[in-house]
Amino acid sequence: MSRGLGDVYKRQKDTLYVNLFIPSRLTWKDKKITLVQETRFPDEEQIRFRVEKSKKKAFSLKLRYPSWAKGASVSVNGKVQETNAQPGEYLTIHRKWKAGDEITLNMPMQVALEQIPDRENFYAFMYGPIVLASPTGTENMDGLYADDSRGGHIAHGKQIPLQEVPALIGTPDSIRNSIHKNNGDRL
């Protein structure tokens, strides 16, 4: 198993942490509980959890609240839960969980521009946690692919003059506000 997949869930005494949003099933033997995570993240902003088995045990469920997900909310069985968590923290719900409980985490995603370090007018386009890219053609690609050889991270192909590179003109806010995800589009 990939090292990262072992970090989807972490248990600590009476607390279950959810760190990654991946369709999965967790059986917590000590608590006699099974939790199922259903998601199409990042194509959908909603992550659903379902308690399949439970002996009505109390514990805290901590859902990671990513820094990009401003305005995230969580509900249990359709009722929105109050939380004081900020982006970059965990949304915490403490209760006695029972079979059939449904938890829904909504994490709104929007287009954001992240300035490239040391480059005043260069930005990366983000949609939630995803860095966006655009196909720009496949001709004249010799020497532009990286590989794992010594120095393979350096492109050895023809350099394209900056004035020939496609550019977007406007302020970061005006450019960001002009980009939208069409309903039904996949990332």
Where in this protein do the model-derived segments appear?
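Edge strands and adjacent loops of beta-rich recognition modules
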Residues: 10-53, 62
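Single conserved hydrophobic/aromatic residue that forms the stacking wall/gate
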Residues: 1-9
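Glycine/proline-rich low-complexity spacer/linker segments in large multi-domain proteins
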Residues: 107-185
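Solvent-exposed beta-strand/loop surfaces of large extracellular or lumenal domains
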Residues: 69-94, 113-120
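C-terminal beta-strand-rich structural cap/linker in extracellular carbohydrate-active enzymes
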Residues: 59-62, 93-108
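Beta-strand-rich binding/interaction modules
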Residues: 56-76
